[in-house]
């Protein structure tokens, strides 16, 4: 029976020592018999199971670094001190020692990343190793040494360091994800307790490559693996279930120490990384670009509220081929499809409902257990549901502005509900074609002053990028309700003019939430928590508006 790790004085209440423990997968060093077992430090002092999230902490001087750490450590006991960010990192050592005296439960990685490996340290290898050894002496339980640095050291130097702290041997590729197995093989020739391999995802499928390495090798080695960049979000969230010992997070959105790093708050609260396991289902929003999407916030809120073991990610797909390979191999169970793929995805689906076929666009994909892909369009629900809550749709006169994908969803959905639908588009031909297909009526702009409607729906982007623009003039607004599909900004010029004309307005946020709610229902079979979803999006839009105003 394995002996329990030695407890530091004052660590009786250390929460790390009361976690569920499992054997630590320490790398067998094939070319170094002396390192085929955990280092003496690991055996004596390191918790057998580290928290899943390590916060990377930086500072412009030792006081700032340690003050940040003091504010974080209660809720985040696993930290990385980026000593290379300090102009004179040696000055931090007394403060680090004092930090551990006050916070004996903390587990800290000391990192002094060299400039040619994405860090800021420009000193000699000897000074780097000396600093890490002193950081270990001050209390840091783990130290990070780059593979390039290790190749310039004798094995005995690394072994000596391992007597004072657990050694993480790290490799970073800031350009691509390639030959990960070859990289690991090189690393295995040197003494270490953890092997950290970080690449850059240039495709979504690079995450699959990384996670396959973790799944294959984590039983033989203690690995930390993830992909950097916007497209690396999959491995940052799901890598821990593939075998990564932990992942890294930033303190706040502006303090990333690597491209694509997610904040600790988002990893825990939005993506629920502590609960991710083999049974966790994966969903995502797909587009190019997709970084602006509010869908992860709204969908993960709904999944958490309804106790669904699933996670929803933003997937920046540059090609459908890349996306579909991930759907198959991760696997991904459902997708929200955004621009530019709503039409292109159709030919890759095994079946669609008749409504989606009519519209000619798909915004929702379900992956069945047999791997087949089924397409739906929930934009119709996004239009119909808000209106049903306010008026009787049968016989209602509704003007739709636009003839694109969103307009098509509105027109066909409203015709199915018995509405009399009119279509106005800047170019007459698309409006006339849509009118013929849906058995609606196309109108010309001069006709608007003679017509009245129950509802006017703006299904164009006019008023979004340029907030001073409106698709209609004030004297052309002759309706009881004006429904603008644009949800950012929250109030468009069209909506302001409609209020001045005495019309009631329906904000685009309602369409966004209702179409998402319908997606949630299709995927889970559960009623969507509408109120929670609306609240999250409202707050997110307010925060986005405040940030934009602060930059002006």
Label each region the model flagged:
Residues 280-391, 489:
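Phosphate/diphosphate ligand-binding glycine-rich loop within oxidoreductases
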Residues 148-279:
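Catalytic alpha/beta core domains of metabolic enzymes, predominantly
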Residues 417-438:
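NAD(P)-binding Rossmann-fold cofactor-contacting core
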Residues 227, 283-289, 387, 391, ...:
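Glycine-rich adenosine-cofactor-binding loop
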Residues 436-506, 510:
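Rossmann-like adenosine-cofactor binding region
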Residues 45, 50-72, 76-160, 166-168, ...:
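Active-site beta->alpha loop and helix N-cap motifs at the rims of alpha/beta catalytic domains
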Residues 485-552:
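Adenosine-phosphate binding glycine-rich loop
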């Amino acid at each position: 029976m394995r002996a329990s790790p030695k407890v530091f004085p004052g660590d009786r209440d250390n929460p790390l020592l009361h976690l569920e423990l499992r054997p630590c997968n320490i790398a067998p060093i094939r070319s170094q018999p002396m390192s085929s077992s955990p280092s003496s430090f690991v055996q004596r002092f390191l918790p057998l199971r580290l928290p899943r999230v390590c916060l990377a902490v930086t500072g412009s001087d030792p006081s700032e670094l340690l003050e940040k750490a003091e504010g974080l450590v209660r809720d985040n006991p696993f930290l990385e001190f980026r000593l290379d960010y300090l102009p004179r990192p040696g000055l931090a050592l007394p403060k680090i020692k004092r930090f551990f005296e006050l916070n004996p439960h903390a587990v800290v990685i000391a990192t002094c990343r060299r400039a040619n490996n994405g860090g800021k340290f420009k000193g000699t290898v000897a000074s780097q190793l000396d600093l890490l050894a002193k950081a270990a002496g001050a209390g840091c339980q783990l130290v990070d040494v780059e593979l390039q640095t290790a190749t310039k050291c004798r094995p005995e130097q690394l072994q000596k360091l391992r007597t004072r702290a657990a050694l993480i041997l790290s490799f970073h590729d800031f350009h691509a994800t390639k030959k990960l197995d070859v990289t690991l093989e090189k690393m295995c020739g040197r003494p270490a307790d953890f092997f950290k391999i970080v690449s850059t995802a240039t495709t979504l499928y690079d995450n699959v490559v990384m996670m396959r390495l973790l799944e294959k090798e984590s039983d033989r080695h203690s690995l930390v693996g993830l992909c950097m960049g916007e497209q690396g979000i999959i491995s940052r969230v799901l890598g821990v279930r593939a075998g990564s010992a932990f992942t890294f997070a930033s303190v706040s959105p502006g303090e990333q120490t690597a491209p694509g790093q997610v904040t600790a708050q988002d990893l825990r609260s939005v993506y629920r990384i502590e609960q991710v396991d083999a049974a966790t289902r994966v969903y995502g929003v797909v587009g190019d670009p997709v970084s602006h999407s509010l869908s992860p916030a709204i969908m993960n809120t709904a999944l958490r509220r309804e106790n669904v073991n699933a996670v929803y990610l933003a997937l920046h797909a540059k090609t459908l081929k890349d996306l579909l390979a991930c759907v198959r191999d991760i696997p991904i169970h459902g997708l929200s499809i955004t621009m530019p793929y709503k039409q292109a995805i159709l030919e890759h689906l095994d079946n669609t409902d008749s409504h989606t076929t009519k519209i000619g666009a798909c915004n929702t994909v379900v992956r069945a257990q047999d791997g087949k892909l089924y397409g739906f369009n929930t934009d119709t629900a996004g239009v119909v549901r808000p209106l049903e809550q306010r008026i009787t749709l049968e016989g209602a006169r509704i003007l739709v502005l636009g003839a694109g994908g969103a307009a098509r969803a509105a027109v066909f959905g409203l015709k199915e509900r018995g509405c009399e639908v009119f279509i106005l588009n800047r170019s007459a031909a698309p409006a006339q074609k849509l009118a013929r297909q849906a058995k609606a009526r196309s109108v010309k702009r001069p006709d608007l002053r003679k017509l009245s409607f129950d509802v006017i729906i703006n299904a164009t982007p006019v008023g979004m990028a340029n907030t001073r623009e409106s698709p209609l003039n004030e004297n052309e607004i002759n309706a009881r309700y004006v429904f603008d599909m644009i949800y950012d900004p929250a109030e468009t010029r069209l909506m302001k003019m409609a209020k001045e004309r005495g019309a009631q307005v329906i904000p685009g946020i309602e369409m966004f939430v209702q179409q998402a709610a319908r997606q949630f229902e299709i995927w889970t079979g559960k009623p969507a928590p509408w109120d929670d979803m609306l609240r999250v999006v409202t707050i997110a839009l307010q925060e986005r508006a405040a940030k934009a105003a602060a930059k002006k």
